[in-house]
């Protein structure tokens, strides 16, 4: 009985070994076994030829054979008496045969779906290639496919490893999308990038707004710093003219993009433009968006107004510092007119800085507004 159990264990190990090997290796093993079979047949035939005399002697000793047969019958009766003892090994053998059948069915199924399995295992590589080439929509399709596999086969170790690789790539995708926000983008591209971030990034809507406005502010500051070589403290007219133009173009563009992407106007958050304090020389050194961790939720409710207030402080600081140095009345009038049109553009996106400007420019700004209003009425 111990021998039978050992044989069953060896057979079970042999079958498990077969099921773990690739199909091509099984074919090779099959060919080797077939060759061994042929050798055994030839060996058996040779043995028959070599033992011919023994067989003849066996035929001449039929009495001994019949006696042996009688002994075999006796042994058979003994075997019948021990049937109950043999039941469990037989049952194990039957279960073993059932297991072989199941393994064969699984192996056959694996062979049939091998091309599909190969494609699934290549998913992280394809996803990474799409990220490297900025094919973001295709990357999200691969991500969705991976998560569908997770929903259906979440307990499978191969799928779990696949999902781990995909989630690592999603982090890489998110980082690359955030890097895209650091570049000047057209509205269509910007909407797509923010939409992708809503899917991939574990960020709230307020955090997305913060990231967008943070990089928008950095882009605006970069454009303004590029104007520094034009600055002449004794005659800053050229610098102010270019400065106002940059504010008009870039600030209008980024606020318009913000409204288009997030569906929120600065009018929704601002109480009145007049609530902005007159800036001083220390205002530009502060962080554009100061907040503490506990106040982040409250900050998310008025993030755009914080950005607009910072923009107002920036404009008012520069005008307060350099506008008095413009002595020529014609040049000053031209700058005020340009500033008026700049404010008109910003007003279209919900940012009116008339009141803060009136506090630092006084009657000159009020006269400009009055004269332009009179011209429109005329």
From Swiss-Prot:
How does the entry describe its membrane topology? Peripheral membrane protein
Provide the protein's localization: Golgi apparatus membrane
Where is it mostly found? Golgi
Keywords from the named record? Golgi apparatus, Membrane, Protein transport, Transport
Which Cys pairs does UniProt list as disulfide-bonded?
none
Q: Pfam families, per this entry?
A: Dor1
* Any one annotated GO CC term: Golgi membrane
The record, for SUPFAM superfamilies, names: Cullin repeat-like
Q: Which domain of life is it from?
A: Eukaryota
**Gene Ontology biological process:** intra-Golgi vesicle-mediated transport; intracellular protein transport
Against PANTHER family, the record matches this protein to:
CONSERVED OLIGOMERIC GOLGI COMPLEX COMPONENT 8, CONSERVED OLIGOMERIC GOLGI COMPLEX SUBUNIT 8
Protein function: Required for normal Golgi function.
Q: Which family does it belong to?
A: Belongs to the COG8 family.
Assembly information from the UniProt record:
Component of the conserved oligomeric Golgi complex which is composed of eight different subunits and is required for normal Golgi morphology and localization.
What is this protein identified as? Conserved oligomeric Golgi complex subunit 8
Recorded source organism is: Schizosaccharomyces pombe (strain 972 / ATCC 24843) (Fission yeast)
- What gene codes for this chain? cog8
């Amino acid at each position: 009985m111990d021998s039978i159990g050992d044989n069953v264990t060896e057979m079970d190990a042999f079958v498990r070994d077969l099921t773990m090997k690739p199909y091509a290796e099984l074919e090779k093993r099959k060919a080797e076994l077939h060759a061994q079979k042929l050798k055994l047949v030839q060996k058996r035939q040779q043995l028959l030829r070599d033992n011919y005399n023994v067989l003849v002697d066996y035929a001449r000793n039929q009495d001994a054979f019949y006696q042996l047969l009688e002994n075999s019958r006796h042994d058979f009766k003994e075997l019948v008496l021990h049937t109950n003892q043999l039941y469990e090994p037989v049952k194990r053998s039957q279960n073993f045969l059932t297991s072989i059948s199941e393994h064969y069915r699984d192996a056959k199924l694996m062979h049939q779906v091998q091309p599909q399995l190969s494609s699934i295992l290549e998913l992280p590589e394809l996803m990474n290639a799409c990220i490297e080439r900025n094919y973001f929509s295709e990357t999200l399709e691969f991500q969705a496919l991976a998560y569908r596999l997770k929903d259906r086969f979440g307990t499978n170790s191969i799928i779990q490893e696949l999902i781990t690789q995909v989630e690592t790539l999603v982090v890489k995708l998110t980082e690359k999308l955030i890097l895209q926000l650091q570049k000047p983008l057209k509205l269509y591209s910007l909407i797509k990038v923010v939409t992708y971030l809503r899917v991939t990034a574990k960020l709230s809507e307020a955090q997305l707004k913060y990231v967008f406005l943070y990089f928008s502010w950095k882009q605006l500051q970069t454009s303004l710093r590029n104007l520094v070589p034009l600055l002449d403290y004794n005659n800053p007219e050229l610098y102010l003219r270019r400065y106002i133009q940059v504010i008009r173009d870039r600030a209008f563009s980024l606020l318009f993009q913000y409204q288009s992407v997030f569906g929120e106007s600065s009018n929704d958050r601002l109480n009145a433009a007049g609530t902005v304090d007159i800036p001083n020389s220390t205002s530009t050194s502060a962080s554009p968006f100061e907040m503490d961790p506990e106040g982040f939720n409250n900050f998310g409710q008025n993030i755009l107004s914080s950005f607009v207030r910072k923009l107002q402080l920036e404009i008012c600081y520069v005008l307060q510092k350099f506008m008095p140095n413009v002595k020529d009345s014609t040049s000053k009038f031209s700058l005020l007119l340009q500033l008026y049109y700049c404010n008109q553009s910003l007003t279209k996106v919900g940012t009116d800085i008339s009141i803060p400007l009136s506090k630092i420019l006084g009657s000159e700004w009020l006269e400009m507004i009055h004269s332009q209003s009179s011209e429109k009425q005329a």
